[in-house]
């Protein structure tokens, strides 16, 4: 008979595997019994972090608390995280939004803030005082004189592409690059640039061709909204 609760050592440390075929009450009973039977095992000494793998199911906050309480009261193990093979509706919705490309043909004027969860394509200008926030990449077919914030939720792999003009500012995750008038002495009306975070954790401004090299997946992006 297959056990519904197992404790195993993995390359990531100690994991408790809870069968997704068993009810929560069965898991609670078997987990309590297993920990009671192993009072003298290596897991009952010094405190150890443990991951709880729950398979193809989701636990409610109450169920996670019940499992956590059993482990806390019957062992020296502390749960670092619960891991599931499935995602909640909210997580799926957020993933879908972040994977989309939003597009708009307009002028972002002073005081306006446009925020999208995925990649963003603007056909138009960003005036001084205007701002774009995107959790993904930002592409502007127009003049940029305002603020472009790509990867605003912490995505340092995001890039910005467009024609940066004074006094524009580029932000990627928590990095900031501000342009001054000296940056534009040799810029022509047709110059397009890319902005990205390099290996040193700094925003770099380079030619538009650089995107294909540093983010090859972007050259194949499709979509729209």
From Swiss-Prot:
GO terms (BP aspect): cell morphogenesis; division septum assembly; regulation of cell septum assembly
Protein function: Cell division inhibitor that blocks the formation of polar Z ring septums. Rapidly oscillates between the poles of the cell to destabilize FtsZ filaments that have formed before they mature into polar Z rings. Prevents FtsZ polymerization.
InterPro entries: CAP/MinC_C (IPR016098), MinC (IPR013033), MinC_C_sf (IPR036145), MinC_N_1 (IPR055219), Septum_form_inhib_MinC_C (IPR005526)
Species lineage: Bacteria, Bacillati, Bacillota, Bacilli, Bacillales
UniProt keyword terms in alphabetical order: Cell cycle, Cell division, Septation
Entry keyword Methyltransferase: no
Gene: minC
Subunit structure of this chain's protein: Interacts with MinD and FtsZ.
Protein name: Probable septum site-determining protein MinC
HAMAP family: MinC
Pfam families: MinC_C, MinC_N_1
